[in-house]
């Protein structure tokens, strides 16, 4: 069983992989503005040990899944919109 820090780091690593993602994700990140929560998570994931968000993130365990779901939902929606646009052209 993972301790709290390991669990949160594993969520962060999985989310960071999503954010690094494939070419589509990179294009989506450039084209669409992400919500505030997602930007906070992105900032926290870039430098988790140095981030002012990481301590707060660790202290609110229930926030982890919410943030992960938010990131996943925003990227899924942005990718859908991007794919729709390229199909329309």
Predicted regions and their residues:
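A preference for well-ordered globular domain cores
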Residues: 1-89
